[in-house]
Amino acid sequence: MKPIQTVLVLGGDRRQQSLADALEAAGLAVRTFGLGEKSARAAADLEEAVARAQAVVLPLPCTKDETHIIGAAPQIPIDRLAALFLPEQLILGGMLTASVAARLQRGGCRVIDYYKCEEITVRNVVPTVQGILKQLFEQIDYTVFGSSACVCGYGRVGRATARTLNALGAQVTVCARSGAARASAETDGCASCDFQRLPEKAASFDYIINTVPAPVLGAQVLRILKPSCLILDVASAPYGTDFAAAERYGVRALQCASLPGKAAPKTAGEILAQGILHLWEEEGYV
């Protein structure tokens, strides 16, 4: 394999600009498209930019609608972009569905979902939690200290969120399916319950932060919440909240996507760049 020297960074949010900066700092020749940049590295023609790149880095997530690259201006249809890729190119994107990955590689190029890189997902927890706190602080008019919080799910993000809220003085209840996860939450200083018992406790919460990408906050829970309760759903699609039911019951429920790009785009972009460079090294592209 030839070492990668030329990279096109395409679409996305401010993380992609930071990612491009970090790849440039690593000595790569970087061009961008669809980021709204006015620098010398910003390409004016998509076809030319793709043709000159050994690797193309797509955003995280790559798409919301499975039709267009997210955040690109002007809009870039996925199928139009895929038609430009060459067999020898390496294409990287975040949170690729099987359908999107298949369409991207139809010309024979290699496609890698960099969000499956554990280094990236582990490091990405910190800017994600910062984004959750930013959203929470913007929505509440009381202190976190002394508040009653529920965190649904106790994976990486759920655990870091619960620990942080606990450190800020919140009374945190972790709702998780796994007995091991609940035990872990209790050793971290939180209360715990399973999802069957959530309706019994729901009326006491000031806010709920959901990290589970499966239906866990339905009408049975939503109708019990106090009117001032806030839900921040930070899970990936299909999310965990019945937003239509939340609206019916007058519950404030916010779908919070791409939090690292909103709260800490510089750090989040550097995390992506570092992980991608290590991924290339492991795959023999360096």
Residue ranges and their predicted role:
Residues 13, 36, 97, 177-178, ...:
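Residues in the short beta-alpha loop(s) of Rossmann-like NAD(P)-binding domains
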Residues 8-18, 23, 145-165:
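Glycine-rich adenosine-cofactor-binding loop
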Residues 26-40, 168-188:
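NAD(P)-binding Rossmann-fold cofactor-contacting core
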Residues 5-47:
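N-terminal glycine-/charge-rich "phosphate-binding" loop or analogous flexible N-terminal tail
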